A protein has these predicted regions:
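A short, N-terminal "cap"/entry segment at the start of jelly-roll beta-barrel domains
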Residues: 1-27, 128-140
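Short histidine-centered beta-strand/loop micro-motifs
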Residues: 18-24, 41-46, 63, 70-72, ...
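A short beta-strand-loop-beta hairpin characteristic of the jelly-roll/cupin
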Residues: 45-75, 85
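Conserved metal-binding segment of the jelly-roll/cupin
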Residues: 35-38, 73-93, 100-104
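Double-stranded beta-helix
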Residues: 88-140
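A structure-centric signal for secondary-structure junctions around beta-strands
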Residues: 27-29, 48, 96
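Conserved short histidine dyad/triad with adjacent acidic residue
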Residues: 9-18, 29-45
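Short, charged/polar surface micro-motifs in flexible loops or helix N-caps
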Residues: 26, 37-39, 58-60
């Protein structure tokens, strides 16, 4: 699983208990994402823009309703994703990838993650459900 370190604003996340290192009324969120080899994030979208910068290796970003497009980013490349576009990413390296991520909007504007229907189906098959607020959680 990937680790998500919130630097400015909570931004978009499934773990409601996370607190950012820098609090305040910022119009953007900054995070560092640690992604183990072969791991990443499945197709999803946000209500605001998102920008990725892989800091220590390559990163594969895929997008489109069926993930029909993809690009391999090199270290320090930048990739900007517009509002509402289904996207995902993967670490193709043999080491942990660290990604600098910026998401537009305040915590209130960002909203929740919108998962692709296929991702929701896989999550439910693996024992996850959505709570009353729309967040994924274990059935237990």
């Amino acid at each position: 699983n990937k680790n998500l370190y919130k630097i400015i604003n909570k931004g978009v996340l499934e773990n409601k208990g996370v607190e950012p290192a820098i609090e305040g009324d910022h119009r953007f969120g900054v995070s560092l994402i640690e992604i183990p080899p072969g791991q990443g994030a499945n197709l999803h979208s946000h209500e605001t823009e998102e920008v990725f910068f892989p800091l220590n290796g390559k990163m594969i970003v895929f997008w489109g309703d069926q993930a029909q497009y993809q690009v391999e980013l090199n270290q320090w490349d930048c990739f900007s994703v517009p509002i509402g576009l289904m996207r995902g990413f993967k670490n193709p390296n043999e080491h942990i990838l660290i990604v600098y991520s910026v998401v537009g909007g305040t915590d209130q504007e960002v909203g929740k993650i919108t998962w692709h229907p296929n991702v929701i189906k896989l999550a439910e098959e693996s024992g996850l459900i959505f709570d009353q607020e729309g967040y994924l959680k274990d059935k237990k």
